[in-house]
Amino acid sequence: MVRVVLATHNRNKALEFQQILGDAVPGLQIVGYDGPEPVEDGITFEQNALIKARAAAERTGMIALADDSGICVDAMGGAPGIFSARWAGRHGDAQANLRLLLDQLADLPDSSRAAHFTATLALVTPEGETTVVEGVWPGRIAREARGGHGHGYDPIFLPDGHDVTAAELGPEAKNAESHRARAFAAIVPVLRALSRPGN
């Protein structure tokens, strides 16, 4: 069995990670991280994910998995991007963040509301070896918040191929196709290799 520390204090994110991984990696045990959160001063999702994973690997001496993710709106040059969690100024105020984004896009027609979620996962071993993968979930921004599932910007994100928001999809449907699901699909082979006997 291999233990991997999940470098996040975000309960919603940790739950989503557990749900997505499920039984995909036999012999893998995900453990929580209670160490200090490093300053995320990178300018890309990849840089911030690596900062978090390296800090957790160094502190725990374990393999660490971290993500950095956000929503990127084409008409805003990719913003909020890495600033998604603090778009309205205060980190973690999801309601204020999505209200501000809706206000900023209020005058845009539906044809100009393209957006995507990005999730970048970084896996770092105690020896400093790194693997970085990315998942992208294309869609568009709705005109109002809808749905009670999910978190963050889910209530205003309409995934391509759906007329419902990510928050209306429900956890199973969302976890089958979200940006994190796509990133996890790319990291699972690496985790499986690490959990094989002899590694």
UniProtKB/Swiss-Prot annotation:
- Enzyme Commission code(s) on record: 3.6.1.66
Q: Where does the signal peptide begin and end?
A: none
Annotated GO MF terms: dITP diphosphatase activity; ITP diphosphatase activity; metal ion binding; nucleotide binding; ribonucleoside triphosphate phosphatase activity; XTP diphosphatase activity
Q: Which GO BP terms, alphabetically? A: nucleotide metabolic process; purine nucleoside triphosphate catabolic process
InterPro entries assigned to the protein according to its UniProt record, in alphabetical order: dITP/XTP_pyrophosphatase, ITPase-like_fam, RdgB/HAM1
**How does the cofactor bind to this protein, according to its record?**
Binds 1 Mg(2+) ion per subunit.
Q: Which residues bind substrate?
A: 8-13, 69, 151-154, 174, 179-180
Chemical reaction(s) catalysed = XTP + H2O = XMP + diphosphate + H(+); dITP + H2O = dIMP + diphosphate + H(+); ITP + H2O = IMP + diphosphate + H(+)
An annotated GO cellular component of this protein is: cytosol
Q: CDD domains in the record, alphabetically?
A: HAM1 (cd00515)
Instruction: Name any cofactors this protein relies on.
Output: Mg(2+)
Please tell me which top-level EC class this enzyme sits in.
hydrolase
Keywords per UniProt: Hydrolase, Magnesium, Metal-binding, Nucleotide metabolism, Nucleotide-binding
Residue numbers annotated as active site = 68 (proton acceptor)
Q: How does it assemble?
A: Homodimer.
| Family recorded in the similarity comment | Belongs to the HAM1 NTPase family.
**What this chain does, per the record?**
Pyrophosphatase that catalyzes the hydrolysis of nucleoside triphosphates to their monophosphate derivatives, with a high preference for the non-canonical purine nucleotides XTP (xanthosine triphosphate), dITP (deoxyinosine triphosphate) and ITP. Seems to function as a house-cleaning enzyme that removes non-canonical purine nucleotides from the nucleotide pool, thus preventing their incorporation into DNA/RNA and avoiding chromosomal lesions.
Q: What is this protein called?
A: dITP/XTP pyrophosphatase
